[in-house]
Amino acid sequence: MAVGDQTEQNYLPKKKKSETEDDKRRKKIVPGSLLKAVVRPGGGDSSPVDGDQVIYHCTVRTLDGVVVESTRSESGGRGVPIRDVLGNSKMILGLLEGIPTMHKGEIAMFKMKPEMHYAEIDCPVSAPENFPKDDELHFEIELLDFSKAKIASDDLGVIKKILNEGEGWESPREPYEVKARISAKSGDGHVIFSHTEEPYFFTFGKSEVPKGLEIGIGTMARKEKAVIYVRKQYLTESPLLHIDQDLEEVHFEVELVHFIQVRDMLGDGRLIKRRIRDGRGEFPMDCPLQDSRLSVHYKGMLLNEEKTVFYDSKIDNNDQPLEFSSGEGLVPEGFEMCTRLMLPGEIALVTCPPDYAYDKFPRPPGVSEGAHVQWEIELLGFETPRDWTGLNFQSIMDEADKIRSTGNRLFKEGKFELAKAKYEKVLREFNHVNPQDEDEGKIFGDTRNMLHLNVAACLLKMGEWRKSIETCNKVLEAKPGHVKGLYRRGMAYIAGGEYDDARNDFNMMIKVDKSSEADATAALLKLKQKEQEAESKARKQFKGLFDKRPGEITEVGSEIREESKTIEEVDETKDNDDDETLEEEGATTVSTERKRKWSEKAWPFLKNVMLQIGIQLGVVLIGILIFQFVSAKFT
């Protein structure tokens, strides 16, 4: 940035901070309604600000010195100081304005008019019973401590004060295994228990410690030390820590010694990744989240009593690691999902159900169908995809072509979701590519159109014909005469029973490019066949609907409903795209489409039937009108 730009930026108007409710309340303060006298000076130069937790004793007296209420035990209170978070807690106006003027350890006397305490209009704090809220009063405040607060619960029932910062960004969560040293004191400072030598071990999410403590620990980093303030509503019973349920609040001092990452990958407890040895780097920034080339050692075991080992790369592969590219379906889905969340050098134990293990993947010897397995995986390292930043146009297109070719291979293997992901990855990268001349622009545009149509082909194979149409539209909106776009969209229209739209697209192909007439004619023949099949299906399914007497119409309706229950089981067509190829690949795929939704299949039949119903109703209405006319004529 140039110096002139920097100077100009310094003089740009700053965004005005929005006014808070507390700011609005402060504007109502009348001079002389709040007076302060320092009884004992505090230490240091700093004072609390919004976002700080303040801990203080408060004694309220009349101007004659009679104690109205107090937190101090010697003045009739419980001995438990008040904890508030400036800017978050509901406070009387006098303290909201007065406490930020104090230093730690200071004792001050605030003389308040009624409107500065509980007589304030719309005061957010209710006055205690029998409190003289219409009187001028003295509030003696001792500011015991203040510090930055981490609010762990919206109702301020759990607040954390950091004593020593931890390491890294990761915090424990369900179902992580936690190792922590924990001590506890009541709100008045009495020690409940001290466990500073041997740490506690517990699992997140199993209610082994009070709820508030678990919430607070969930905000901590490894080796962090903190005080977690927990109010009564979060002091739930737990088997590991016994807390008196009569206590109003407890202060837990916690040192998070270690935690073991345990991840429920599916959220239902079936696919679990448990870290055995930490890796190098920060989670998740240094994990192979993107498609990468990975190198791993692994041991596969059956989930039986013997933990039978069916494969060990160190033994069965002569200590040579397995190397594979993620995002290509080269390993079981559960295996790949977990390795994407590993750090280099990490060892993890993965427990996997059969549908994410070998039921949908070639089974190794010794693994039966429906077998649950465990893998012990060590991520040795990985190579990330080449960064396109700084590459020239030709290099970028070469990289794009490599990824597209991989997608085409996956498509031919019937791995449509994986293929789609490859095409979409290139399309995302293309958002940052700027061709420099007309030739580059044409190459870039043609490639992008090709990728969109490949995505559309994947969606069609996956049964998502509507999304396939929407994707084709991205090409046709910019280039209405794109022949392959018209063909692909026409096929998607056929899949959805939108036969008129399909016919329009195929006819448009012939109009814009005579060389496509053979393909368009073949598509029109296929369309005609589909229409005939749909018509025949409709006649068969609704046979007898108009032959029934009026009293029998309900019975016919029930027949229709019975037929509709089984419509999803009817394979009305073969693969719509037997002759269809991906751009420049020239190879047909060997895979059947997923079953479409009932509504998508049934619509052409229902449309035909509704037309017939309309005709029949019209005939009936005309008959009624003629009858009424004749009757009127002869009466």
UniProtKB/Swiss-Prot annotation:
TPR repeats: 400-433, 449-482, 483-516
Molecular function via GO: peptidyl-prolyl cis-trans isomerase activity
Top EC category: isomerase
Gene Ontology biological-process annotations: auxin-activated signaling pathway; cell differentiation; cytokinin-activated signaling pathway; embryo development ending in seed dormancy; embryonic pattern specification; establishment of cell polarity; lateral root development; response to cytokinin
Keyword Nucleus: yes
Biased composition (Polar residues): 1-10
Ranges where the record places region Disordered: 1-28, 569-593
Protein name: Peptidyl-prolyl cis-trans isomerase PASTICCINO1
Species of origin: Arabidopsis thaliana
